[in-house]
Amino acid sequence: MAFYPLQIAGLVLGFFGLVGTIGTTLLPQWRVSAFIGSNIIIFERIWEGLWMNCIQQAMVTLQCKFYNSILALPPVLEAARALMCVAVALALVALIIGICGMKQLQCTGSSERVKAYLLGTSGVLFILTGIFVLIPVSWTANIIIRDFYDPTVHAGQKRELGGALFLGWATAAVLFIGGGLLCGYCCCNRKERWHRYPVPAYRVPQKDNQRNVTVPRKSSTSYV
């Protein structure tokens, strides 16, 4: 029970990481229209996400449309889709394993060792989820920044960083922290059990010639 707060904090952060991963995957604000040069259209904003693009007109009307073809999408978008879907699945599995490893739920019996390993596994999966979220978000941001400063790209085709990218970075940080706490609990639990049950000292067996031999005591009777 000494490390119970680490379990709670790690699982709570993991839950928020799962919610953030789902939000980052579904939100269309990965790429937003840039207002530079002659492209100053303040009454229309364009959002581009993994699954749809949206056009907001006059800050009131919002029209969204899913991408019609999967094969016609850019390879970067297809890779980002795949990585984010894997991230959602990993976060969900990690959360389920972490809940089963909690001390209050007797899913694993009374073995503290099994529970610690389950929470450690959950932490590793949360960290992997953070990596899977960080890769497509940072990759997309790098492409946006590169095209923004590329003079050969038309001003109407340039985009800026959307809110979903910032949400993805924050989600990756939360997943790293939550996974680190759960892995830390697993390590601390192993050290605690190591000190609680010290290794018994090794005793060298005695040889046969070193055994104690009882010598009969001589009688003290005096002969007259």
Swiss-Prot record:
The keyword Transit peptide does not apply. InterPro entries: Claudin, Claudin_CS, PMP22/EMP/MP20/Claudin. GO terms for cellular component: bicellular tight junction; chloride channel complex; plasma membrane; tight junction. The chain crosses the membrane at residues 8-28, 82-102, 125-145, 165-185. Residues 1-7, 103-124, 186-224 are cytoplasmic. Residues 29-81, 146-164 are extracellular. Expressed at high levels in the kidney and at mucher lower levels in the brain. In the kidney, expression gradually decreases from the proximal tubule downstream to the distal convoluted tubule. Expressed in the thin ascending limb of Henle's loop, as well as in the thick ascending limb of Henle's loop. In the distal convoluted tubules, expressed only in a few tubules. Not detected in the collecting duct. In the brain, expressed in blood vessels (at protein level). PROSITE patterns: CLAUDIN (PS01346). It is a multi-pass membrane protein. Keywords: Cell junction, Cell membrane, Chloride, Chloride channel, Ion channel, Ion transport, Membrane, Tight junction, Transmembrane, Transmembrane helix, Transport. It comes from the Eukaryota. It is found in: Cell junction, Tight junction; Cell membrane. GO terms for biological process: calcium-independent cell-cell adhesion via plasma membrane cell-adhesion molecules; paracellular transport. The keyword rRNA-binding does not apply. It catalyses: chloride(in) = chloride(out); hydrogencarbonate(in) = hydrogencarbonate(out); bromide(in) = bromide(out); iodide(out) = iodide(in). Disulfide bonds: none annotated. GO terms for molecular function: chloride channel activity; identical protein binding; paracellular tight junction channel activity; structural molecule activity. Belongs to the claudin family. Does not form homotypic polymeric strands and it is not sufficient to form tight junctions by its own. Interacts with OCLN. Channel-forming tight junction protein with selectivity for anions, including chloride and hydrogencarbonate, and for solutes smaller than 9 Angstrom in diameter. In the kidney proximal tubule, may be involved in quantitative reabsorption of filtered anions. Does not affect water permeability. This is Claudin-17. It comes from Mus musculus. The lineage of its organism: Eukaryota, Metazoa, Chordata, Craniata, Vertebrata.
